[in-house]
Amino acid sequence: METFWLRVSFWVALVGGVISDNPESYSTNLSIHVDSVTTFRGTELSFVVTTHQPTNLALPSNGSMHNYCPQQTKITSAFKYINTVISCTIFIVGMVGNATLLRIIYQNKCMRNGPNALIASLALGDLIYVVIDLPINVFKLLAGRWPFEQNDFGVFLCKLFPFLQKSSVGITVLNLCALSVDRYRAVASWSRVQGIGIPLVTAIEIVSIWILSFILAIPEAIGFVMVPFEYKGAQHRTCMLNATSKFMEFYQDVKDWWLFGFYFCMPLVCTAIFYTLMTCEMLNRRNGSLRIALSEHLKQRREVAKTVFCLVVIFALCWFPLHLSRILKKTVYDEMDTNRCELLSFLLLMDYIGINLATMNSCINPIALYFVSKKFKNCFQSCLCCCCYQSKSLMTSVPMNGTSIQWKNPEQNNHNTERSSHKDSIN
């Protein structure tokens, strides 16, 4: 058993990225039944090894605190520093990547269209998580306690932290759904061409996405409280989900299934449905003189569709291990089983891997756009080199809405001016 734990600790140290740790579970021992050791954009495993149950905290379902596993968990110093380094890396990449993406879309008029507006909304949600949540995660990892735990600001952070975590994931999920719908609309209206700009319907969608994401995150702000506990003779407080009402008890019971269904399955199902419809639409309109005339636009729209599909696949790969771990713990794990300890240690390892991958999703979208989209690749290179508008050579590029745009020097003739604002409708 001791050798097994050494192996687990070793692999956790290797695969551990940022512990995107939601204070939802401050467990004291492997055998304690915890609501959700991990949730979205973070959940945490206990960083403090203790055998004291926090006071004012609901006991496990059987009302007992016995049947501990013979081994306890602890976070080694090496593991903390490894995760801190990776966390800082994700912070830098997420800050630079998402901020640059927002700047590109804001400063280039040819990039201001429906799908790019949704991508900007996606990047802004990731940026909020990176700027606010990651520093708190690193502090908790190194200090082993909740920041400002003894004053009111700590209580404010306890409410804000999980609220922003869940809101950020909601923004990601709903924007991916909106992008899938947008791609189908673009193909269904493939003969329509209109000017540059963000359609009103897309602006309404984005506002609705943010409002709905905040509303769905309200239970997190309500349920998370500062819970006092004793550790090594000293009094501490930590932030965790503590169900004190019937609604919160219900929310706590169905939370894993709710997260899996709405925050994971829904964008995948939505993408599958609308991409199937989009494929059928393309096959049905494969012939015809109008299609031949607009073949370039159709080709560009297919490229955009592939980019959106790539973002959805990355989302699925990043979040699947975490959801799988949560569902296995909900369905297979039995806290009263005497042989549960090895299973729980495996689930904890899956939690670490899943948490790290889920956290990386907040910085990977700009990287994916760089490699998938030639237009974004050119803009990233020019923007990061501080020469976005200083190019003296003619550059022909394809924005995310599938339009052929030409950038010309002021000295050149204006006979292509109309083409510079030519844009096919994807909305």
From Swiss-Prot:
Ranges annotated as spanning the membrane: 81-102, 113-132, 160-181, 206-229, 257-278, 307-328, 348-372
Family annotation (SUPFAM superfamilies): Family A G protein-coupled receptor-like
Organism of this sequence: Ovis aries (Sheep)
Keyword field contains Transmembrane helix: yes
Main location: membrane
Function: Receptor for endothelin-1. Mediates its action by association with G proteins that activate a phosphatidylinositol-calcium second messenger system. The rank order of binding affinities for ET-A is: ET1 > ET2 >> ET3.
GO term, biological process aspect, one: regulation of blood pressure
Leader sequence segment: 1-20
Phosphoserine, modified sites: 425
Region annotation (Disordered) ranges: 405-427
UniProt keyword terms in alphabetical order: Cell membrane, Disulfide bond, G-protein coupled receptor, Glycoprotein, Membrane, Phosphoprotein, Receptor, Signal, Transducer, Transmembrane, Transmembrane helix
Name of the protein described by the UniProt record: Endothelin-1 receptor
Pfam families linked to this entry: 7tm_1
Extracellular compartment residues: 21-80, 133-159, 230-256, 329-347
Entries under InterPro entries matching the protein: Endthln_rcpt (IPR000499), ETA_rcpt (IPR002175), GPCR_endothelin_rcpt (IPR051193), GPCR_Rhodpsn (IPR000276), GPCR_Rhodpsn_7TM (IPR017452)
Comp. bias (Basic and acidic residues): 416-427
Coiled coil regions, renumbered to chain: none
Glycosylation sites noted in the Swiss-Prot or TrEMBL record: 29, 62
